[in-house]
Every structure is written in C-alpha cells, then in structure tokens.
Curated annotation (Swiss-Prot):
It comes from Escherichia coli O157:H7. Residues 10-68 form the TRAM domain. This is 23S rRNA (uracil(1939)-C(5))-methyltransferase RlmD. The active site is at C389. The keyword 4Fe-4S applies. S-adenosyl-L-methionine binds at Q265, F294, N299, E315, N342, D363. NCBIfam families: PRK13168.1, rumA. [4Fe-4S] cluster binds at C81, C87, C90, C162. GO terms for biological process: rRNA base methylation. One of its GO terms (molecular function) is iron ion binding. InterPro entries: 23S_rRNA_MeTrfase_RlmD (IPR001566), MeTrfase_TrmA_AS (IPR030390), MeTrfase_TrmA_CS (IPR030391), NA-bd_OB-fold (IPR012340), SAM-dependent_MTases_sf (IPR029063), TRAM_dom (IPR002792), U5_MeTrfase_fam (IPR010280).
C-alpha cells in the first residue's frame, strides 16, 4: 500500500542587505548592484543607501523592497499627493522633476544609441486634462468608492485629491463624489470620466443598469450647477448627451471638435509644443506633400495642412477619420485627404501608397509601425518624424530606417506624463544624400 506524505514547506528568512543606489530607471525604480547582480528597488533614488530585502530573484536581476532608508538623496522631494505610494497612477513624485527627466532621457539614449538633444516639457503639476475614475459600491458601509487602482491590484484607492489633474478637474472630485454617492443607482455605476476641453468640462458616467427619473434629474441639476457637459453611457457603444454641445479644444491655432470618447492627448501643454516642434523638424515648405500615418483625428495632420501643399492622413478607426474630415472643413482646410485603412495589414495596395510624398510623420500606438516601415522607405521621403509612446518598438522600427540609409538627426524626450513611468519620445530621421 502506497503511503503519501505532504512535503514540508521550506521556510526561508529573507536576509536584509545594505545597498547603495547609483541610478534611476525610466520607471522610477532605484538601481543598485549586489553580488554582481542588478537590483531594482522602488522608492529609492541615486545617492541613497538603504537596507532592503529581495522579493524576486531572477538569473540576470532581482527586485527588492525597502526596509529602512539610511540616507536621502539631495533630489528627493516630498510627494504632493497623500495617495502616493498606494495609488498606482504615479511612481516618481518622490524624485525631483529634473532627475525624472534625466533618467528617462538616459534610458532613451541607451535604447536608441543616440544622444537626446532636448526635453519637451511643460508644467509638471496640474497637467492632466482627462481622467477615468473607477466606481465601486461597498455594501457594508453603503458608501461609494471613487478613485484609481492600487499599484499592482484591482482594488480602488479612494481618491480625495489628485495634483496631476488640471485644477478644474481636481476641484470637481469632492463634488462629483457627493453627487454620485447620493444616487439610487450607486450600486450600478462602473466609472466616471472627467475631461477638460477648451469649450468646458465634460463628465461621462458609465452605468450598468437603467437610471431612475429621479437620478437623471439629480445628475442634470448637478451638470447645470457646475457648468458641465453631461453624457450617460449605458454600455460601451451608446453615449447619450444630457446637457452640452459638441466639445472642442484649441491646438496650434486650430479649433478641433471631438467626441467625449475620442482619444485626445491628456497633456495639452506638451501636445502643443510637440506638434510645433514636429512641424519645425520637418521644415514644411509650401510645395511639400506630407503623409501622416496613424493620424487619429488630425492632431498633426491639420496643423501640417496650414503649411504644406497637400497632406494625407491615414487612420484605422473610422470615427476618428470622420472627425478629422469634419475638423478640416471647420477650419477651412481643403488640402487634406483622410483615408480609413488598417496599417497593420498589407499597405502596398492601399490607395495612399500610390502617391508620392516629400515628408512623413507617424504616431503609432504601443505596438509600433513595423508593417509600414518598408513602404515608408520606398517613398524615399527627405525627412521622417516618428512620435513614439513605446521606446522598445521605436528602437525596433528605427533599425529599418537606419539600414535604408537614414540617420537620426534629432531625438527628443517628451515629458508627457511627469511623475509616472511613461516614456514618450520623438525622432527626426534624415535621408543621407
């Protein structure tokens, strides 16, 4: 008869080690060395010593957490947000803005094997003009939670303030919480989005069950008292306008309308500077034919059209193409053509690919633009500006251009999301004559 024994669980005592941090990675983690291995330690900065314990041990690197900080970096800051360290939104409020920008620029330079020529930045606080706050009803307390997810968790941090939001949105937080917490339907609320446009403030409420007439009336009164445009979203497809008209924002001398669910850059200040610098780098001439790939609703396309002879924008989301066409008409731009095409498919047979272009701009999503790089090379543009939200795919796509005889003329770090681990960038490629 076979006998089975439970294996004894191994108990290990986590050893406390003392480390000196010599670098900060782009995600805001302190970097140290111990026994020949790289350690990543959240919460520590260069020039700091600390006692830490290893939480994850891999072959090439390890992760650790702080037990006790023994010294402070001169670039350590007191976080402005009381939720910092618990809320998953920000990772670097404890570091000076200058250190954040230097560490991100250094990471970008290492990846691209090229010096970062400039940092395009704006105000480091009160910059975010869009936020989605999760909502969760707690039956025990009969209270409504409203906030962001905890770091590495689906739990919600009940947010009372958020200093990276534009002041208009941060001031609204307690009022929105009070309003939503008084609804009969607070058990059936998914999330609320707040957007600050030039035209005013938008509030989009996702609800998972029909709202009573009393709740609708209460929300409408709230929107009027706070001067909000209110939209109700019973599902991911339907959007009902309760109050307000088509929102819009100013961008580089143009007025752009958008739907509340459309993607717009959350940092208006950096977006304005980024668009202006892209046009400057491309050196757009009145006779130029310019191609804008992954163009969205025309963030770059329409400003380009104010300077070039003709501009073609290509985008995979039909609603954004329609919005781009509408905004071209509103701004009296008749030299723009938008195409709805999937740029992840074979682009050689797409109508835009038959045209000739002098200059190209592309602003792909995180997956990058591998599918269009060879077509761009065939077009032989003089200058190419690549705007990236993922340095890894940027480095990959850049290889194709470098092999084809292009060189990196300028490389900028875009500080689009201060105090977070997000790294955005923009590169100018020039064709070698």
């Amino acid at each position: 008869m076979a006998q089975f024994y439970s294996a004894k669980r191994r108990t290990t005592t986590r050893q406390i080690i003392t480390v000196s941090v010599n670098d900060l990675d782009s995600f805001g983690q302190g970097v140290a060395r111990h026994n020949g291995k790289t350690l990543f330690i959240p919460g520590l900065l260069p020039q700091e010593n600390a006692e830490v314990t290893v939480t994850e041990d891999k072959k090439q690197y390890a992760r650790a957490k702080v037990v006790r900080r023994l010294s402070d970096s001169p670039e350590r800051e007191t976080p402005r947000c009381p939720h910092f360290g618990v809320c998953g939104g920000c990772q670097q409020q404890h570091a000076s803005v200058d250190l954040q920008q230097r560490s991100k620029s250094a990471a970008l330079a290492r990846l691209m094997k090229h010096e970062v020529s400039e940092v395009i930045a704006d105000v480091p606080w009160g910059y975010r003009r869009r936020a989605r706050l999760s909502l969760n009803y707690l039956p025990k307390t009969q209270q409504l939670q409203m906030g962001f997810r905890k770091a590495g968790s689906s739990d919600i941090v009940d947010v009372k303030q958020c200093p990276i939001l534009v002041p208009q949105l941060e001031a609204l937080l307690p009022k929105v919480r009070a309003c939503l917490g008084s609804l009969q339907a607070m058990r059936h609320l998914g999330h609320v989005e707040l957007v600050q446009a030039t035209s005013g403030t938008l509030m989009i409420l996702r609800h998972t069950a029909p709202l009573s007439s009393a709740d609708r009336e209460k929300l409408e009164r709230f929107s009027h008292s706070e001067g909000l445009d209110l939209y109700l979203a019973p599902d991911s497809e339907i959007l009902e306008t309760v109050s307000g008209e088509m929102p819009w924002y100013d961008s580089n001398g143009l007025r752009l309308t958008f739907s509340p669910r459309d993607f717009i850059q959350v940092n208006a200040g950096v977006n304005q500077k980024m668009v202006a610098r892209a046009l400057e780098w491309l050196e757009v001439e009145p006779e130029d034919r310019v191609l804008d790939l992954f163009c969205g609703m025309g963030n770059f396309t329409l400003p380009l059209a104010t300077q070039a002879a003709s501009v073609v924008g290509v985008e995979g989301v039909p609603a954004l193409v329609e919005k781009g066409q509408q905004n071209a008409r509103l701004n009296c731009l008749q030299n723009v053509t938008f195409y709805h095409e999937n740029l992840e498919e074979d682009v050689t047979k797409q109508p835009w690919a038959k045209n000739g272009f002098d200059k190209v701009l592309l602003d792909p999503a995180r997956a990058g633009a591998a599918g269009v790089m060879q077509q761009i090379i065939k077009l032989e543009p003089i200058r190419i500006v690549y705007v990236s939200c993922n340095p890894a795919t940027l480095a990959r796509d850049s290889e194709a251009l470098l092999k084809a005889g292009y060189t990196i003329a300028r490389l900028a770090m875009l500080d689009m999301f201060p105090h977070t681990g997000h790294l955005e960038s923009m590169v100018l490629f020039s064709r070698v004559k």
